[in-house]
Amino acid sequence: MHASTLTRCMRVAQNARCLSTAAASVQVTHSERGARLAALRERLAEETRQGPTFAEQALSLEDFAFEADAAPGTKPSRKPNASNRKPKWLKAQPTQGANYERLRKSVKSLGLSTVCEEAKCPNIGECWGGGKDGIATATIMLMGDTCTRGCSFCAVKTSRKPKPLDIEEPNKVAEAIAAWGLDYIVFTSVDRDDYEDLGAGHFAKTVSTLRAKLPEILIECLTPDFQGHDNLIDQVATSGLDVFAHNMETVERLQRRVRDYRANYKQSLHVLERAKVAAPHLVTKTSLMLGVGERNEDLFQTLRDLRNSGVDVVTFGQYLRPSTKHMPVKSYVTPEAFAEWQKVAEQMGFLYVASGPMVRSSYKAGEFFMKNLLKNRKTQVVA
């Protein structure tokens, strides 16, 4: 027998042994799966006999949401069709009206940035136009319009080295807000990891400048995580604000998929906890996006963690994809499901819960409640 023929025979025999081993492995795998399925069926049958759990009674997201992803192995279509078109309840007010135009021109003339514009908030027409109550609301975005982080859900511009901070911004902001005649204002900001203090000093100065100019105004601040540094969190928390907000964004399991690698679940919890330590009178607040792949058990655990951290206010909103470059929507959650989550959170002891497809962390849904809550707290502190 030629050497080449012998070599081929040996290869055939070796392949046969490999196939035999693989088949045995598959048989074992199938056997294990069968056992697991049998155990699962038995457990489900037992749970059915015992009745539904609290979580099942409270909410089943599968009953209230539909998937928005393309089929496995295919790209999501950019054209609207029956499978990827937004549901009818996701309708925003048009961006028009006298109040809207007045606020837009004022913001532009002063060279200010708003998260309403930069993050493409769907509520800009309602908030800037005044909505049903006729009160115009804007959220001022401090420290520029470019962030040093790149979260997969966010439409704000990113750069490793954004433009330097405008040292006159605190005064500009205070003058603008005084001219608008507001009694409740929300500040937020981009992340500025390019500064040694991560922008905490600039943020705190803006708050204290406004407080000195308008002592009675109520100030809510939606802050970055300041990389979890206590001294920086304390600096902002004690600068004169009334509401300290920092967004968890999503459940622990999905943090890396949704947020920049420098953000994380435990760090954000610590930020909210530390703000209370630095200023116990503060109302603390956070926001969660739904429709990014979260599960019921994930949300329940997140709510428990937030309550254990002393968080007072939570909001739920639907994630909407800013562009095809961003993270796709996993599911559109119905208004009924949002209402159920509001009930669950209220039963867990949160002071206020805003929950709905169009709700955002800076949305004005809670302003009237927050104003009354804060005024009552201030009265108690004085007393």
Swiss-Prot record:
[4Fe-4S] cluster 1 binds at residues 116, 121, 127, 362. Residues 1-19 form a transit peptide. It comes from the Eukaryota. The keyword Transmembrane helix does not apply. It is found in: Mitochondrion. Residues 69-97 are annotated as: Disordered. GO terms for cellular component: mitochondrion. Binds 2 [4Fe-4S] clusters per subunit. One cluster is coordinated with 3 cysteines and an exchangeable S-adenosyl-L-methionine. This is Lipoyl synthase, mitochondrial.
